[in-house]
Each structure stands twice: as C-alpha cells, then as structure tokens.
C-alpha cells in the first residue's frame, strides 16, 4: 500500500509538453489537446516523466465535429446542469464553441459549483485517447441525448470539505477542466467578492478515479473571460498564473494541490511578471499534513511556494496537503497588490506628459477608438440652437449650389468638399467604419464641434464590393382642368418591381430658411493608434474659444499609443480666447506611451491671427428706413518648428464696408431688404514644406499647402406681415372628395440665378392642407394670428470660407496618397421660420403673438421644439435635432471681434509591414456679439448629406443615362434625399443640392483605387451622362435605413418637353424611358419622383445582347410627394 507521502506527491503531477495554443477565446475543434496537467489517479505511482498526452483530431473527425447539416442533439438543461456558450455552435455543451453535438458522438456538460458530471461512456475505462473524450450524454441518430446511466442524476455533489475564500474584494474565477471530454477549462466556479464557495472534489467513483483540476484566474476576471482556452495576451484560462487540484482516495483521504502553472512560466514575458495575488491552504481540524502550503508572489513571483517544495514538469513548484474526513480545508485567495505596489513604485513603465492651463482636465489614456464629448454653454433661453448628430454624416448647406461628398478609400479615411462656382459654405464630416484586412489593426478618429454642430468621424480598414446609383427626377405633369382632378390614388402611387431585397422608402417635402446660432465654442480632438510595429501619428489641433458665451471653454487633446515600438511626440497647440466671456478657460494635454525599440518625432507649425469688425443697424420708424455699416480688419502670421522645414510668412488684411436700407409698407405687405458685404484679402496664402525620414525605411512626408481664399458675406432679409383678423393667403382651392388637392398657398417667392454655365428659376412655397380626410403627404402646417404681427419671416446670413490641406505620404512597403479637406462655416445673426420634418410626418412652425408656437403631431410645444429622425444604425442611435426660437425684431446693433488659431503638423514615422497615413484638420471660425435692444430670434437648420464610393472592377457592366429638355423649361433645384446607409455598406451614394437637370454622379474604382466623376449640364438644352462600372461576379445588396428629409424648390414651366432614358451601353438596350409633354393651364401640380436603382449581380457567363432578366435588373422603390403651386393663367 502506498505511503501517505507517496499519495501526496502524486496529486496532479503529470504534465504534458506544451503544444500549439489557439488564438480563439476557446480552443476550437481540431486543436491539439493540452493543458500540461494530467488527471491521473492520485493513489497510483506515476513516473514524473510520464509521456505527454498529445491528442489530435484527424481531418475526418474534424469534419464530423464541425458539420452543421447533420443531426444534432439539443442541450437538455437538466437539474444542476450549466450551459456553456449556448449561443455558439456547441449550444451549451461543455465543448469548443465551434464543436457540435451530432449523432454518434458523446457530449459532455458542466454542472453547478460543488457538483460533478455523473454520465459518461460505460465502456471508456482508461485515460487514453479517444476514450478520454467520451463524457456526458450520447447523441443518437434520432437527435436525442441519451443517459448511459439512466438511474443516476445528470450532476451529483462532490465529496470532501473543500472551499475557496476570496479576500481580494474583486471575486475569483476557478475554472475546472472537462474530463472525460476535451480537457478545456470550461466548467465555471465563481467566488463572489469577500465570500466563500464550495469546490467539487471527486472520489474513486468518478470516471477512471481521476481528480478535479482548476485554473485560478486573477481577481476580478469573470468566468466568461477566464473559463476559456486563452492566449498569451492575457493571463486568463490556461495561461492563468496558478493551478489547483483535488480528489479523495479509497481511504477517504482528501488531497489538495496548489502550484504554479507551467504554461505561465513558459512565456518570456509573463514569467517576469509577479502576480498581485496568492493562494494559501488553511485547515480546520487536526488531521492535515503537508502544511504550510501556499503560493506567495511577493519574493519569487509565481514560484512562491514554501522553501523545499517539490518541482514538477516545466520547473513549476507545487505543494500538497492531505486530510481525513471531519477536517475542513479552505483555499484562501490573498491580495498583495497594495504591498507590492508600494515596494515597486519606482519601476512604473508608463510615461505620461501633460500640460495644463487654467483648469485641470483628466488625462486622455491610450485607446484604439476615442470620441470626445464637447459641451457648449447656452447664451440665454431665446438665442441658442444646438444640434447633436450621432453616427451620421452631417452637412450645413447655406446656399443652393452645393454638392457635399465624403469618399472613403481602401486604406484611408478622407473628408472632401466639392463646390460649384456659386457655392457659399459647407461643413462636411463623415463616419467611416472598416475592419482590418491584414494582420494588424489601425484606426483613427477625430471629433469636431462648431457653432450648433457636434459630430464625429472614425475609420478603420474595410472594403466591400457594392454599387448603388441614385436618380432624382423632378418634372411637372398636366392634369387637366379643375372639373377633372386627378384622384389621390393616382398621385400618391408607389411602383415596385420584383426584388430579392426588401427596401422601404419614405420622404417628406418642406420649405424652410437655414439660419445659425450667433456663436458657439469649438474644439478639436484627434488621436491615432497603431498596433504591433505599425506606427503613424499625425495630429492637427486647432481651437477657438469665441466670445459672448458665458463659461465657454476650449480644449485640445493629443494622444498616441504604440505597441512593441516607441515614439516621441512633440506637438504644438495654440488657442485664442476673445473678450466678452465671463468665465473662459483653455486646457491642453499631450500624452504618450512608449517603449525602447525606436523613436519617431512629430513637429508642428502654428499659426495665429486676429480679426475684428463692428456693424450697426439703426431703424428709424418715422422714415421707415434702416441704415448700417460694417468695418473691420484682420491680420495673420505663421511660424513653424521642426527639422528640414521652410515656409513663407504672409500677412493678410481685409476691410469690410456695407450699408442697408429698409422700406416698410402697410400690412399686409412684403418687406424685404438685401445687404451685401464683401471682404478682400491680400497675400492670404501660406506654404509650409517639411521633409523627414525615419531610420532604415526612408519614408517621407512633404508638400503640405494651406490656403485661405477670399471670404464673402451675404445677408438677405425678408418677411411677410399679416392683418389682425386673417391669415395671409394667396390661393385657395376647395376640397374635392377623394383627392388631396385642398391646399392653401401661404407664401410664394420667385428668384432667378445664373453663373454663366447653368441658369434657372426657383419657386418656394409654404402650404397648408385643408383636407378633411387623412393627408396623403407628410406635410401639415397651421398658423394663427390675433394681433398685427409677423406670421412668417426669414433673415439668413451665410459666410463662405474654404480652407484646404493636401498632403501625401509614401513608404517603400506600400504606397498610398491621402488628401483631406475640411471646412467649418458659421452662419451669423440669423432669424427665420424653420420647419424640420421627421420620417413619418412634417412639423410646420409659425410666429404668433406669444412669440413662437411649434405645432408637432397636434401638440403645442411652447418656446422650444425637438424632432427625432429615426435611424436604424448598428448602435440603435437616433439623430436628434432641437431648436429654440424667439420673436424676431428689426432693430439691433452688432460688433464682431474674434481670433483664429491653426496647428498644422507634419510627421515622419516607421512602418514595418503595414500601411500608415497622416491626416490634417483645419478649422476656420468667426464670432459675433449682439448688443440687443430687444430679443433676437435665432435658429438653425442643417441638411445632412454624404457620399462614398468603393468598388473593385472585374467584369464591368456599364449603364448610361441621359435627359433632354427642350424649349424654355425652367431649371428645377432640388435638395435630394439624405440617406444614412448601413455603416458596413460601402456603396456609391450621393446627396445634396443638385443642378437644374437631373444628373447622376458617377464613380469608378479599379483595383488601383483610382476614382473619377463626370457630370455636364447646360442652361436651356441640358443633357447629362454617367457611367457605372459594376463588379462582376459580385453580389450587390442595398440596405436602406432611412430617408431624413427632402427639400424641393420647383418652378412652373411653359411648353416644355422632357425625355429621360437609361440605356445598357453593353447591350444597347433602353432600360427606361420617360417622355412628358406639357400644356400651360390654369392649374398645375408638381411632384418629386425619387427612384433607388439597385444593380444585382450579373455573372460574366450569363451576359447576352437581350435585356437583363427581371431578377438581374435594377429593383426600384418609388415614393411620390405633392406640392401645390400657385395657379398661373395661360399665356
């Protein structure tokens, strides 16, 4: 009979050699079985040089385990059973996540803490492969999990009085290995903070008289994270620092083992890291032998066993305690973190630098994706409008000749501004989300806050070959005389072709005047994170803290994190605060974490300038006139620091003059005035060139150019006055039964514009519907008037200022070019009637005697209103727009004073096998301080738009579209639909204001990532064409989440004819044709017809000269919205 000492030394001493460790969170089917601790009988002699139990599946077995189409057995959820990852392929069984419980296999399971699995193959009687895998229930050919021992429970309580006590205050995860089974540490036992939990101890009745084996995770690691087949990235699972084991022999003696984990010692990094917790075995009774038994990391780290303890396989120390029945034992988990931290505080490996201004802020810690949160204090209850847009592209469109586009390339995240010759101003930022396409991970993020706008951009590597084309069509149709109106069913119809993809569309039409808040604060946050040895950081920060806002502040943050490499960050930031801020402050932080492999340097160029201007408008009621003036100056200086740099230092100056006159007439009447201010600048451009190289890779960063073009300010004031007893109405049409023709036109204005290339007319109208039946459109409005007051007014001011930054970056491993351009525009001193729709309805708002009333879904919202736009984004977030508007006045004086700062860095970085790039951000802002003699009404309205293009060209499929307009048809100006595609959808979409003729932006992308776009238009006879290159064979799927809103301004036409065709240029087949002739009549209706074309995949082998089949043709979903226009007599 073996002696007690022999039994003690034999507890869990068999260790197998290390083999492959999988990178998955659990070990997958087919991995080599190992955890370096053999579950051997503890009362039999075992040579310490026991041969490794290295078990592998063959290919046939892997296919059998992973096949999903065979018969599978469901997890029974019996008494005391615990499901392991029930949402994975194992469906709750104690197996690898991608291993299935299929017919003809044994499926082990986990039990609650203190309980053991009571079922296994009765014929599996030895610890040899594959018998050691046959635990749990047998899955028969009918898909039923069968008990091999019908009279025994699924789970039964263990023996021995052994428990775990947590003294760390964070809780401990003990993870038991599955045997018989794949021996992964999947069976969870959670010891709550400062509590005690029983451990399951098997006796000789358990399978093959084997012991229970546990991995002891660090404090605070959950069983979800710790009871897995881990990796060396974290000391969890089979990489945990400590192991424990327990069993009872035939003499009812319980043996408990504590020791170091050999796999933890194998790792060159973890073997040098001392855990901050230890294990100690305590007995209550007089039969314990083998004490003291502990693992104390304070001196020797994970090898902190008592002096003289035996050494097992892998050089791991251990100790064993045995005790008889009647004695209880506890494994106490001890916290040494504070004691070890105080003794090694000088060995901290984190380097952090920070600079603080008048207020303290928290350090920005290194992370792969950081989005800053910017808070703007309000001015007062009557002059603030703030918008918050989450996970959406955003654009502020001030004038009517803009197309704002955001493009994403395969290895870059770029925001680009495209403007027509008559454009005013636009701010564009986009959200790009891509996954990694190589072995490393790289991401960048930037967050910008501007007056009334808060947005964010994030980007990571991803691409998907999808292509989408939008065509927006606006035309006028002759409907006959008043006696034969078209019914609502024919106007509001929806045409849908057969489609494999369900696409839901909706749209709304509204009329509003864009305005902006007086001023807000702005700040910039930029960060970049590299993984492994891929290092690239280029941060550009600029902050302007503007005046007239109480408690305004601005912050600049820059952070960098590098793994397995080093960088040094030298960043220069600048900020300026103007006067009129009761409590203004700024703070800056620069943080960097680095190692000792190599270094890189980031240098920067800083620029600062000041501007000031004053304006005053005085109203003289006696003469019904207003006069005013605006004057100001500005200066700009540039300085640079950094190696190999050269620059020019221009000085710019500008002068602004203007005047205004206002003529009032009796009510009701139109009162309008136009004020134009033009600013000219001198030497308003600067060039900065910097070259730098890192060791061995000879990379370069050069050619940075900054420009500041001429600024133009245009202000236009218009309003309508109503009588005390009636609402202003130009046209009224009686309600007809069954149709939607009962509209009252409240206000109609006509204007003409021409820029030398295109020309056209626009008509805007604001209408209310008097239909007693359910409206067919999403447009409703109402107005009330008790005393002579303004029923509708608009004062809009736009400031156009565009800045651009172009940079290129190259490396010998991979070559990419990155171009970024960002403009941030503020609209100043604006007051307007504003209407913002939702998905299902549209809200109209008017001024009344009480100041402002918002009518939204039948609810009077008082002085403020908010509207939510639905968004089916991955995070479930919604875009929320809010505004506060007060009663407008015509008498006010203003002064303008502000300053602007720029920070334009260049960088040189080391690149080891992955692509990195640099990006720059430039911020331009202007400020205004009102001195109010009475309340000033301000509001803001923004239209979001974005476009992206990313396709791979294989077998191209080309379509062309053309439209022809004859005679004197006036151009139609439309704010096209705003679409927020899925974040994972990489497609070609376009939104924004389009020109008079319907044009389709085109883009092609070859494997070299080249892009091109072409459109053409003319004033009288206009044609436009585009070519679309589609990837084949590629499945193209379009998932449209929502339309936000549509704004249309449409003009009456006279005797035009329009033909619109879409042609498959490969087969020369006309896919779609519209030809409409017009006859001038006393009544005219206009609707917007928007069509989404989806191009399904067309295999190269199925191409023919005939028209594509219905399944491969585009799928169209159309919606119609109607706007009633003022009737016009025939010529």
Swiss-Prot record:
One of its GO terms (molecular function) is beta-glucosidase activity. Residues 716-725, 738-763 have a biased composition (Polar residues). It is an enzyme of class 3 (hydrolase). Glycans are attached at residues 58, 123, 252, 551, 593, 631, 689, 766, 806, 857, 920. Coiled coil: none annotated. It holds the Pfam family SUN. One of its GO terms (cellular component) is fungal-type cell wall. Residues 623-715, 726-737, 764-773, 780-819, 893-909, 977-1027 have a biased composition (Low complexity). Residues 1-23 form the signal peptide. Keywords: Carbohydrate metabolism, Cell wall biogenesis/degradation, Glycoprotein, Glycosidase, Hydrolase, Polysaccharide degradation, Secreted, Signal. GO terms for biological process: cell wall organization; polysaccharide catabolic process. The keyword Secreted applies. Its main location: secreted. Residues 609-819, 893-918, 977-1031 are annotated as: Disordered. InterPro entries: Beta-glucosidase/SUN-like, SUN. It comes from the Eukaryota. It is found in: Secreted. The keyword Secreted applies. Its EC number is 3.2.1.-. Belongs to the SUN family. Cell surface beta-glucosidase involved in cell wall biogenesis,. This is Probable secreted beta-glucosidase adg3. It comes from Schizosaccharomyces pombe (strain 972 / ATCC 24843). The gene is adg3.
